[in-house]
Amino acid sequence: MIQECVMDSLNLNKHISGQFNAELESIRTQVMTMGGMVEQQLSDAITAMHNQDSDLAKRVIEGDKNVNMMEVAIDEACVRIIAKRQPTASDLRLVMVISKTIAELERIGDVADKICRTALEKFSQQHQPLLVSLESLGRHTIQMLHDVLDAFARMDIDEAVRIYREDKKVDQEYEGIVRQLMTYMMEDSRTIPSVLTALFCARSIERIGDRCQNICEFIFYYVKGQDFRHVGGDELDKLLAEKDSDK
């Protein structure tokens, strides 16, 4: 898990105030701490769902409050920096990217909470085949989250591009699970309630890939200074190439 990370310099401008640099580094470090918390929450939620571990699920649900509190604290720190330092250019982009990133992390934390609340209410050991498929999808998105946090720590745009494309594989895996679940439902109508719950969980997990993709877009924005939201893969390649040629 990325709980402790040596933050790279990112070529931050040398400010007259060393305190400003310290404040920027502080909030970046806090983002990584929050990211590590969320990654652990998600991993525990997937484990609790697969193993039907009610004690672990309860700890995940309880831990969501800590994630929420950290989001608020980091957001408040961002507001203080903007009000006090009036950052511009890449410094302002960094503060904005941090504020947006923690919102995505908080939503991923909410998914972990929902998985625990929903799956433990509906599933039993007889539904183990459903849980195996959901665990596989969950582990895939956990790896995406781990990788995007690492890319964020280094503001590594090449790694961000790779992770951005990885979401297609998550989508394909999700679609395969949906087909499998529909087959279960057609073969045995008694599975309908549990299948519907599994579909809800699968969709929630799939959305984590989208959240990671959003964080990739924030990395693009910080490094390139251009908003890359709502572009497809081919258009993304073109825009990134154009920005590189402008150097």
From Swiss-Prot:
GO terms for molecular function: protein homodimerization activity. Its main location: cytoplasm. Belongs to the PhoU family. Keywords: Cytoplasm, Phosphate transport, Transport. Disruption phenotype: Has derepressed alkaline phosphate activity, especially under high-phosphate conditions. In single-challenge murine ascending urinary tract infection (UTI) experiments, quantitative cultures of urine, bladder and kidney reveal no significant differences, however in competitive colonization experiments, the mutant is significantly out-competed by the wild-type in kidneys and urine and recovers in lower amount in bladder. Coiled coil: none annotated. The keyword Transport applies. It comes from Escherichia coli O6:H1 (strain CFT073 / ATCC 700928 / UPEC). InterPro entries: P_transport_PhoU, PhoU-like_sf, PhoU_dom. It is found in: Cytoplasm. The gene is phoU. One of its GO terms (biological process) is negative regulation of gene expression. Pfam families: PhoU. GO terms for cellular component: cytoplasm. This is Phosphate-specific transport system accessory protein PhoU. Part of the phosphate (Pho) regulon, which plays a key role in phosphate homeostasis. Encoded together with proteins of the phosphate-specific transport (Pst) system in the polycistronic pstSCAB-phoU operon. PhoU is essential for the repression of the Pho regulon at high phosphate conditions. In this role, it may bind, possibly as a chaperone, to PhoR, PhoB or a PhoR-PhoB complex to promote dephosphorylation of phospho-PhoB, or inhibit formation of the PhoR-PhoB transitory complex. Is also part of complex networks important for bacterial virulence, tolerance to antibiotics and stress response. Homodimer.
